[in-house]
Amino acid sequence: MERVWVVIPAGGRGQRFGAAQAKQYVLLRDRPVIAHTLAAFLGEPRIAGIQLVLPGEDIATGAWRELLGPMPAPLLPPVVGGGLRADSVRLGLEALLRQGAVPSDWVLVHDAARPCLRREDLLRLLESLANAPQGALLAVPVADTLKRGEDGCSSGTVDREGLWRALTPQAFPLGALLAALEAARAGNRQITDEASAMEAQGWRPRLIPGHGDNIKVTLSDDLMLAAAILAARSEEG
């Protein structure tokens, strides 16, 4: 099987979070959010390398190293991200090619602000790749009733049949994902996740059921929820 790499884009500042520092560096149970994010991948023997993509000033000042400490294998030296998430992912993929990855290798892209990824979900995604030539992503079926809003009022109910919430990691062949992101950039298309870039190229990635507690820390309230999730797991042993 081709090697598996990980790209963790953390080039943004998370303006919606409202903290003075980037949300990936905010402390969660006495460790930065991004340290919890990395922990899900460390120790997995199928992962050849983990590529962090960070703001340029964080790399220049070494702020990331002060927060994360020594780089455990297989964490690679970070690279500077771009203005948009898709740009940061693209730059991370290019860095992996310079590190010895090849286009046929698999790459998992995971949000830096998702610190609650379960190891069992990661393993399920990795195991799915043998039968997912067009890629795969963790997702959960939509359970809530969905409303369409107009001028602050509900104007209708959206049929949730067949709807899923996309999570990360999302896994694709490195070369194909890089080409899809470059095509989206050339066409000035909005890319919300890696699957959307691949879907625009006609790909149909597999939806791998994950857990809803793989939340993204976007608002300050999310940090309290993430802390509760991690605390509950710690108590479970």
UniProtKB/Swiss-Prot annotation:
One of its GO terms (biological process) is isopentenyl diphosphate biosynthetic process, methylerythritol 4-phosphate pathway. The keyword Transferase applies. The record marks 160, 216 as: Positions MEP for the nucleophilic attack. This is 2-C-methyl-D-erythritol 4-phosphate cytidylyltransferase. It comes from Acidithiobacillus ferrooxidans (strain ATCC 23270 / DSM 14882 / CIP 104768 / NCIMB 8455) (Ferrobacillus ferrooxidans (strain ATCC 23270)). GO terms for molecular function: 2-C-methyl-D-erythritol 4-phosphate cytidylyltransferase activity. Keywords: Isoprene biosynthesis, Nucleotidyltransferase, Transferase. It holds the Pfam family IspD. Catalyzes the formation of 4-diphosphocytidyl-2-C-methyl-D-erythritol from CTP and 2-C-methyl-D-erythritol 4-phosphate (MEP). Its EC number is 2.7.7.60. The keyword Transcription regulation does not apply. Gene3D superfamilies: Spore Coat Polysaccharide Biosynthesis Protein SpsA, Chain A (3.90.550.10). It catalyses: 2-C-methyl-D-erythritol 4-phosphate + CTP + H(+) = 4-CDP-2-C-methyl-D-erythritol + diphosphate.
